[in-house]
Amino acid sequence: MMRVLAAMSGGVDSAVAAARAVDAGHDVVGVHLALSATPGTLRTGSRGCCSKEDAGDARRAADVLGIPFYVWDFADRFKEDVIDDFVAAYAAGETPNPCLRCNEKIKFSALADRAVALGFDAVVTGHYARLSDGVLRRAVDADKDQSYVLAVLTAEQLARAMFPVGDTPKPQIRAEAAERGLAVANKPDSHDICFIPSGDTRAFLGARIGIRPGAVVDADGQVLAEHEGVHGFTIGQRKGLGLPGPAADGKPRYVTDIDPASGTVRVGSAEDLQVRQVRAERAVWTSGRTPEGPIDCVAQVRAHGGTAPATAEAVDGGLVVRLHEPLTGVAKGQAVVLYRPDPLGDEVLGSGTISGTARTHALDGAAGASAR
């Protein structure tokens, strides 16, 4: 038996995860993270994130399970490590993943550190992933798999984590919650960013960054439009570009490059989005050991995004990932996650924060091509 802290967001997944920890014979205490100093500024129902309504749902679930329950205030830490980081990344022309950062800095760092200090052996959450003997794998339910946003965790962090729902499809989790008498059994999922209640990311960023005008240009550098800040754009974006009309060839145009220093947003064709090589910094290897030499793997560059077979190599604390097939919409600030295919469930090898890419024609030696 272990003494386990159950992080209860107020959703069905974390409630069932806590219940399964109780069933396993562990001494379980529930905790809900208060992540906002201002009531009403977090979106209710956001998976893994917490409004006042979610705190009430979590408390009621703990009552049904018969476990102690507390609310811990992590608002200041959340603002500093997640919200401020999110804003700064967009201002720098990057596209961050706040859920990944929350896992890295809050749930499995600040929360886990406090748990260990209080004598707990592990933190249990409702994440959809599988963890056994230190090996992190994709969840059984591919549509709900969250291994991508957990790939930033170190071996030490994984050693004190538990993911009890990763071996079960979501519909069965809901059915189990109903059988247990948990009122959150049919609570809707939310895939929005919890600290942007309106869902309007551009407005949220604009209020904090302000107006930083720049130009939208084509591949030849011709100015097509003006904009109010690079924070309103991400690589692969097609809508909301403010362009006066379609391209001369009639094909859609996408954001292909963002230069925060000059405020320039470059647009081009879908072909211009293709990437064959990814550079990343701050590599994390889930085994705790940095591999020597190239490794064959499968790379994923967005949560629930497509994958490509690849060869990866550790370089100067980061990664160089050579894709055997092109991927599109690869943005700086996102994570590149490396998997090893396995019939038992694809194994997470490691991750890094994308710092640059090279396009297909650049690697093929085409004249005038450039890396970004």
Curated annotation (Swiss-Prot):
- Per UniProt, what is one GO molecular function of this protein? tRNA binding
What are the record's GO terms for cellular component? cytoplasm
Q: Which cystines does this chain contain?
A: C102-C194
The source's domain of life comes to Bacteria
Q: Per the record, a Pfam family?
A: tRNA_Me_trans_C
Q: What is its main location?
A: cytoplasm
This protein's UniProt keywords? ATP-binding, Cytoplasm, Disulfide bond, Nucleotide-binding, RNA-binding, Transferase, tRNA processing, tRNA-binding
Tell me the residue numbers annotated for binding ATP: A7, M8, S9, G10, G11, V12, D13, S14, L33, G126
Region annotated Interaction with tRNA, chain positions? 144-146
UniProt keyword RNA-binding present = yes
The residues responsible for catalysis, as annotated, are C102 (nucleophile), C194 (cysteine persulfide intermediate)
Question: What role is this protein assigned?
Answer: Catalyzes the 2-thiolation of uridine at the wobble position (U34) of tRNA, leading to the formation of s(2)U34.
**Family in the record:** Belongs to the MnmA/TRMU family.
Name this protein carries in UniProt: tRNA-specific 2-thiouridylase MnmA
| The species this protein was found in | Nocardia farcinica (strain IFM 10152)
